[in-house]
Amino acid sequence: MRARCLHPGCASKFSLQVGGGNDHMTRHAKTHARADGEAAAIQSRINFNPDGTSRGIFVYDSARQREALATLIAVNDLPLGFGESPGFVEYIRTAHTPSFTQVSRQTTSRDMKKLAKAGRVAMKEQLVSSIFSVSITSDIWSGRAKQDYITVVAHYVSSSWELNKRIIGFELIDVSHNGVNIANAILKVVTEFGLTDKIFAVTLDNASSNTTAMNTLIPIFEVYASKFLLHQRCACHIINLIAKSALDDLDPHINKLRLAISWLNASNTRLGDYRNYCAVINVPCHGLHLDMPVRWNSTYLMLQLVLRDQVQFSAFVNANFIQNDGEPLLVEATWHVAETIFKFLATFYESTVTLSGVYYPTSHLIVHYILEIAQHLKEYENDATLLVAVYNMKQKYLKYWQNIPLLYAIAFILDPRAKMEGFSGVLSLLSFTINVSYDQYSLDVKDKLQDVYSKYELKYGPAVAHRPPAVPASGRGKKKVWGKIFGTSTATPSSSTQTPVLQGGGELAKYLNSAVLATNDDDDDDFDILQWWQEKRSTYPVLSILARDVLSVPVSTVSSESAFSLAGRIIDDRRTSLTPDMVKTLMSVKDGELARRRAQHTTENPELIAAFEAMRWTEDQDET
C-alpha cells in the first residue's frame, strides 16, 4: 500500500506497511507546516512605499501576480514565456515569495487577452458616456514579417479636463492601401467604439490616398461638428516636406564633415586612437554618426554632435587625414557653414518637437510656428550658403501654409491671450513677411467661427439655464512674442473699449469683445489653456465645450507613428511569429498601462535619437 501527500502542489508518495510506523509521513507534514508558516509571514506583512510611508498589509494574491506579470511582459516587450524562465522564477521565490508558481506562455497569453478585453471595455464606456468628442489620427506601418498594420489613435479631453491619447485600433491591413480601404479600416474601428457621431477631426499625413479616404469619411463624421474642420493635415509632415526640400542644396556644404566622420568610423584602430586622444586632452569622447540621406532631422542631430566636439575632432582629423593637396580637411570655413546650417535647421526641429506633444494642446500653437517659420525663411533668404535652399523651402511653405487651415485659426482665437485682436496681428505680420493679403481671410475666419459656434449653441445651448456675464481678463505685460503680435513695444494689448469685434450678446461676442488675457514673463510658457477654459465654464458654458473640442485636435500624426515604435519593439526579430491578434493584444495592454502612468508622451523620434546617443563612448565630464 502507498499513501499520497494531500498538500497543494506536492506529489510525494509514501509506503505503508501493516504494523509499521508513520514517523516519515509526520516529518514530511511538519516540513510543509514550517514552509507554510514562513510563506505566510512573507505573504502577509506591512508594505512600505519608497519614502517610508505604509501601504498597509500586503497579502500575496496569485491572480494579481499573474495580472502584474502580464502587464510587465507587455510594457517591457519581454517574451510571453518569461514567467516560466528559470532565472525569473528563482528570483521571485528567493526575493519575494517562495510559493510562487511559474506561469506558462499559454497562461500568460490568456491573461493578456483578458487584460486587453477588460481595458477596451472600460475605454469604450468612458468614451461613450463621459466624452463630448474625439479627434483621431491614423497611419499605416509595415512590419518585419511583411504584414502591414493601420493604427487609429483617439485624442480627447476627459471630464477632468486632461488631454488623453489612446490607441483604439491596431489592425492588420492585408489589402491595397488605397483611400477606400483606409476609410473602411478607420470606420471599422470608430464604429466598434461607438464614436461615429463623436468625431470632431481626423489628422492624417499628406498622402493622396488619405485625401480619398476623407472624401468617404467626411459625410459620415460631419454629424458632430462641421465639415470644414474634419480633415486636418499633419503639420509635422508639412514641416518635414519644407525642410527636406533643402537637403539637395545643403549636402555639398557638409560633405567634408561626412567624409571625416566616415573616415573615422571606417577603422577600429582610428576609433581607438581618437578615444586615446580625447583621454589625453581630458575631454569627453563621443561617437559620431553619419546622417541618413532622406532625413533632414538626422542631419540636424549629426551636426549637433559634431559641433559639440568641434575642437578635438577637427584637430584629430587634420592631424591624421592627409588630402592629396596637403591641405587640412576641416578648416574654419567648414565649421562656419556647418554652424549656419545647424542654426537654420534648429527652428524646424524644435517646432516639430513641440507640435508632437500628446498631453498638452497643440492646435492653438501651430499659428505661432507658421508665422515663426515664415519669418525664419525671410531672415535667411539672402544668406549666400542657403540662398537656393531657402527659395525652394519658401515655395513648399506657400503651397501648404499660404492658406492657414481654419481649425488652426479658430484654435488660436480661442487662446484668451490672443483672441481676434492677436489673430489680426499675426495676419498683419504674415502678410508683410510673405507678401500675401489676408483681409478677406480674416473675415472668412470670423464667419466660420460664428457658424460653428451657432451649431454648438443649438446643440448645447438649451441645456444652459443661466449664463453669467463674461469677466474681462486682467493683468499686465506679455512676452516679447505677444508684443510682436500686438505690434507694441510694451507687449500690452489695446484697450477693451475699442470697437466691438462681434456684435450681439452671446457668449462668443462677450469672449471676443473682452480684453485679452495678459500673462507675465514668468508664467506665460506654463499657461494651461485647458485649465483656463475649465475655470470659465460657468462664464462660457457653450463656448467652453467648443474650446475643449478644438483644443483636443492634434496637429501631428506623431502619436500614430509612435504606436509603430511600440509595434517595432513588440514584433522584433525574436517575435515575428506572433499572430496579428496577439500583436493587437500586446499593443492594447502596453498602451493602457503607459496611459495610466501618463508615459506615452513622445515628442522626439526615439529611434533616431538613440542611433546618435548610443554612439557615446564616455560619460560627459563637467567643464572646469
Where are these regions (language model features)?
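Short Cys/His-rich metal-coordination motifs, predominantly Zn2+-binding knuckles/fingers
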Residues: P8-K13
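C-terminal recognition-helix end and immediately following basic linker
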Residues: L16-Q43
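Alpha-helical cores of eukaryotic small-GTPase signaling modules
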Residues: L301-E327
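Short, hydrophobic/aliphatic alpha-helical segments
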Residues: E67-A70, E222-V223, A279-H286, Y397, ...
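Mobile genetic element proteins and their domesticated derivatives, centered on retroelements
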Residues: C5, M25, F88, S104, ...
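Active-site neighborhood segments
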Residues: F58, N76, L80-A279, H286, ...
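C-terminal regulatory segments
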Residues: L163, G169-F170, D174, F200, ...
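Long, low-complexity intrinsically disordered tails and linkers at domain boundaries
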Residues: M1, A35-G83, E90-Y91, G477-K479, ...
